[in-house]
């Protein structure tokens, strides 16, 4: 799939938010329509997964159960991925949440009129320990493995994610001067846009106020 990372840099009042909202709208609408159309199938698959989990828990509590019986149910459960409602566009997301969303959806679009969300990956909530691996690997679909002590490992075989952000110049300066972003090569993967201001020259299609 095509992956593009774009960053628009503009001063306040450049209508960054309306433009980002316009870009995001069809993705939100498509996900909504798809989820509505497949809602019953999703709920059915979720119920089947929970039933199989309950069967496995009940089987493990039996005294006369064999290892083969447990292994068979575990295999069946591992082959049945839990269904979730489709997500395409994500906004303010943490690295941990992004792993789960990519596991469920495979491909995503990170889109926001605030590039400050990239601070989530530079260590804002992890004691200044950066976590850019997933952003880098989802650019070309490289396998990503998330190991956590409190849960099973998550393996993303081919994660893909495009990034579409807009920010003010001071945020852009902080990104350029961030050694983590520069050293990782992340900022070199973006296409940058510096729009020319049209303040004072904008045309509106609103009806004129009639004279009294």
For the regions a language model picked out, list residue spans one by one.
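Phosphate-handling catalytic cores of nucleic-acid transaction enzymes
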Residues: 1-212
């Amino acid at each position: 799939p095509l992956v593009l990372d774009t960053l628009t840099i503009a001063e306040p009042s450049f209508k960054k938010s309306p433009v980002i909202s316009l870009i995001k709208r069809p993705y939100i609408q498509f996900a909504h329509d798809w989820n509505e159309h497949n809602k019953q199938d999703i709920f059915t698959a979720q119920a089947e997964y929970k039933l199989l989990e309950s069967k496995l828990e009940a089987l493990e509590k039996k005294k006369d159960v064999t290892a083969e019986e447990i292994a068979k149910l575990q295999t069946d459960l591992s082959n049945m991925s839990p269904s979730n409602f489709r997500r395409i566009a994500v906004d303010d997301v943490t690295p941990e949440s992004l792993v789960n969303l990519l596991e469920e959806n495979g491909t995503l679009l990170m889109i926001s009129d605030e590039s400050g969300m990239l601070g989530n990956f530079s260590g804002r909530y992890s004691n200044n320990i950066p976590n850019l691996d997933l952003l880098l690997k989802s650019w070309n679909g490289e396998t990503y493995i998330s190991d956590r002590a409190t849960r099973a490992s998550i393996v993303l075989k081919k994660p893909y994610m495009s990034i579409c952000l807009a920010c003010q110049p001071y945020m852009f300066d902080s990104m350029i001067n961030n050694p983590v972003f520069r050293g990782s090569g992340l900022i070199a993967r973006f296409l940058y846009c510096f729009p020319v201001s049209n303040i004072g020259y904008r045309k509106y299609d609103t009806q004129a106020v009639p004279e009294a």
